[in-house]
Amino acid sequence: MTQDYKATLHLPATEFPMRGDLPKREPAMLERWEREGFYAQLRANAAGRPLFVLHDGPPYANGQIHLGHAVNKILKDIIVKSKYLAGFDAPYIPGWDCHGLPIEIAIEKKYGKVGVKLDAAEFRQKCREYATEQIDLQRRDFKRLGVIGDWDNPYKTLDFRFEANEIRALAKVVDNGHLTRGVKPVHWCFDCGSALAEAEIEYADKVSPTVDIAYPARDPAAVAAAFGASLPAGVGVAVPIWTTTPWTLPASLAVSLGAELDYVLVEGPADRGQPRWLVIAEALAAKALARYGVGEVVVHGHAKGAALEHMLLNHPFYAEREIPLLLGDHVSAEDGTGAVHTAPGHGQEDYQVSKQYGLLERYGAAQINPVDGRGVYLPSTPPLRDTVLAGLHIWKANDVIIEALRETGVLLAASKMEHSYPHCWRHKTPIAFRATPQWFISMEQANLRADALKAIENVHWYPSWGQARIAGMVDGRPDWTISRQRTWGVPIALFVHRETGEPHPRSTELLRQVADRVEQGGVDVWYTLDASELLSSEAADYEKITDILDVWFDSGVTHEAVLPDRGLPKPADLYLEGSDQHRGWFQSSLLSGVAMDKAAPYKQCLTHGFTVDEHGRKMSKSLGNGIEPQDIMKTLGADILRLWIASADYSNEMSLSQEILKRNADAYRRLRNTARFLLGNLHGFDPLQHLVALDEMVLLDRWIVHRAHELQEKIVAAYARYDFAEIVQALLNFCSVDLGSLYLDVTKDRLYTMAEDARGRRSAQSAMYHVAEAFVRWIAPVLSFTAEELWGYLPGKHVDNVLFATWYDGLAPLPADAALSGADFDKLLVLREQVAKVLEPMRANGAIGAALEAEITVAADAQTAARWQPLAEELRFLFISGDVTVTAASTDDIFVSAQPTTKAKCVRCWHHQASVGSDPRHPELCSRCVSNIEGPGERRRWF
């Protein structure tokens, strides 16, 4: 009867669960971290180390967090945790952006606009309460993601201290000469009722009307003469313009030409029976005339645009308004007519060229900009012949103006076109340029543009194309409009002279005094402040500005308002946000930083892409393809979400679907099972008593420590350059190849069959201990919950949390004098694959059931054979086969052959050995197993 030898084997045993059960375990860990003050402990443990500051870009305090929020916060968390392991103190202070229109709209929906049910102070208080509620909801979800940080003490742009620091930051900007005030055309949202910054604009397709309008020359003969032409009697001359915004024609004050463009004087369509010649850019003449129904291009003269400067035209429907011809660099011959109708109240280039020619001084504000903040023509807007424009919304006015002009002879062509047009990012509605009195941070006044472009060069951009992208944006951007005509925000706390409109000469000092008061009582202090308290006898000459600061200024000055307050250095080491922030937070922070300190507020800038479904489509409720992070955490756990984020190429769009989540759950199981196998085989191992020195290890064990050392160097370098996908791939490969299909498989024999305290067994356990110690650290930044769980099961004494440790220092490369080098092992592993290929058909045809039933012969050249023959006795353990013979042959190749063994099988180790039955006490065991049970035990050197 077969004796049961199971009790003599040392099979794996661990209480580390096979199933992660993350949705249940993770919340329990979070509760413990909260209870124990984990973040405070982490900071205390890292005290005195070099600082690494990842400064948090504040999400807006409105609505539940979505997948994009999760991507952003988890990427930041991975970096922060990797920095602790790398020996840094890496404080993370989360923040929230709390002012602005979305919160105002939420309060307006409930209480109406300011003055309906609530006065301004009450309205601001409701906004403050709403934002605070939203922060609490978002904070709960961010913490559930496993993100560590100072959640009990975040920065909020609504805090009195922050609001005060923001006003102090404005004082610095003023002090350095960057603030300016003027009536300039700015992006204006009629739904917001306010100016918009560049970052608040997104482009979408819009169908617009296109019209060609003729501006008749006041002195047709003079225009013809500039072309060297003699004008026949009864022939008129006009300059046609092409525009997609007919609603701006009432504000048209000039027509701009290109100084060096070539223009032709051509025969155009008749004007109510009167012949008419037109001035058109030569490159566009044929196309324009075709639009007007003129088939043949008849040219009467050529001239440069410069020859027509200062000549006068008539406005197409305001006969008393003379329209000068100006020269502008913005005019091109790409489309239209080469002549641009110029409305300085509704276009940046129009404004600049009109200012250059002194045109603005000749007109009143209502003529420059006849449109109010709701998009309606002012009461003073003159009619178009019999058509009343006053009170008409500009989007309706387009068709009305076109119809009215059909009767006048100035409408040469009308059509429709779809084109990319600026829209409000909140309302998704078209916006317009509108000249209004605003406060600006000037890009030129104190060299801000040039200084910002220089500062960009001193920042490390991830990906590298980010540098060119933001540089192009800064190079081409207009002045930064920082004023908003809204209620909920930080006031532009300036006093301006009632007559001149100039800021008080002591503005920076006064701003700081106001800031001190705001720090005690919040922004309401500004609105209740009696000017005489600060200005004394001057108070009657000055008035307070009631505009508030752009929310991009709020978030853009966090480097000034937060970091010094928390004892953290400037510039921050890293800013990390979505790729849309090149025109948003990265840029507002850059401009404010350069305006205040002549330097970027960050050393490195990293961007991530947006989340899309598996087909590359944007996730949305209407498509039904959205995946919420809360749902992932409830069903799979935060660690699965974190693994997906780490494994994705976040520099591009990040695809997610249920199938992708399933693949990540499978990858997680592979990592968890590897950890569990390591722990199972470390049962009964105490590193203080049983650890075998590296130079005394069995060579295979020493090799796996060497491989782990190589991998750790790769992983640490990848964390440092934020390449998390490489880390995940390398980890999975290590678990599958180096450990799973090789090392863990080969060492089972030693671990299970040797005596418990045998040197060969303790050697394998020591190697696994080193690998486990390193492994738990490798995964900790990504799989934070699982790493914490695993940390609690490692043998030996440890600090309380894996993040209190640093990268494992127990690994080392193979020494130069090792009996087997890394290259030797590589060759042996190739040989192992060769053996497996030879055995495959034998298994398939039933010649053997398992590799242990085959005896192997390896024939190699004399030098290789001599190198491998000392290993032959143990090669069977590497191949997990029967006995192995190595022979020398006159060949450069290596030949492997195999034959079924005829030897008996040992019931304990399952190896087929001639020694089975040689000991009468154990007739079914091989001599090796007998020795391992009763004798001194076997010795291993190689495998």
Curated annotation (Swiss-Prot):
Where in the cell? Cytoplasm
Q: What does the record note about the cofactor?
A: Binds 1 zinc ion per subunit.
E.C. number: 6.1.1.5
Name the coenzymes or cofactors required.
Answer: Zn(2+)
Name any Gene Ontology BP term: isoleucyl-tRNA aminoacylation
State the reactions this protein catalyses.
tRNA(Ile) + L-isoleucine + ATP = L-isoleucyl-tRNA(Ile) + AMP + diphosphate
Return the Pfam families for the record: Anticodon_1, tRNA-synt_1, zf-FPG_IleRS
Q: Where is motif 'KMSKS' region found? A: 618-622
- Molecular function (Gene Ontology), one example: tRNA binding
Q: Which InterPro entries does the record cross-reference, listed alphabetically?
A: aa-tRNA-synth_I_CS, aa-tRNA-synth_Ia, Anticodon_Ile_BEm, Ile-tRNA-ligase, Ile-tRNA-ligase_type1, Ile-tRNA_ligase, M/V/L/I-tRNA-synth_anticd-bd, Rossmann-like_a/b/a_fold
Keyword Aminoacyl-tRNA synthetase carried by entry: yes
Q: Which residues bind L-isoleucyl-5'-AMP?
A: 577
> Which UniProt key words apply to this protein?
Aminoacyl-tRNA synthetase, ATP-binding, Cytoplasm, Ligase, Metal-binding, Nucleotide-binding, Protein biosynthesis, Zinc
> Which residues are recorded as binding ATP?
621
Listed PROSITE patterns: AA_TRNA_LIGASE_I (PS00178)
Q: Which top-level group of life is the source organism from?
A: Bacteria
Subunit structure of this chain's protein: Monomer.
Q: What does the record give as the function of this protein?
A: Catalyzes the attachment of isoleucine to tRNA(Ile). As IleRS can inadvertently accommodate and process structurally similar amino acids such as valine, to avoid such errors it has two additional distinct tRNA(Ile)-dependent editing activities. One activity is designated as 'pretransfer' editing and involves the hydrolysis of activated Val-AMP. The other activity is designated 'posttransfer' editing and involves deacylation of mischarged Val-tRNA(Ile).
- Quote the entry's note on domains: IleRS has two distinct active sites: one for aminoacylation and one for editing. The misactivated valine is translocated from the active site to the editing site, which sterically excludes the correctly activated isoleucine. The single editing site contains two valyl binding pockets, one specific for each substrate (Val-AMP or Val-tRNA(Ile)).
Q: Which family does it belong to?
A: Belongs to the class-I aminoacyl-tRNA synthetase family. IleS type 1 subfamily.
What protein name does the entry list?
Isoleucine--tRNA ligase
What organism is the protein native to?
Xanthomonas axonopodis pv. citri (strain 306)
Query: Which gene does this sequence derive from?
Result: ileS
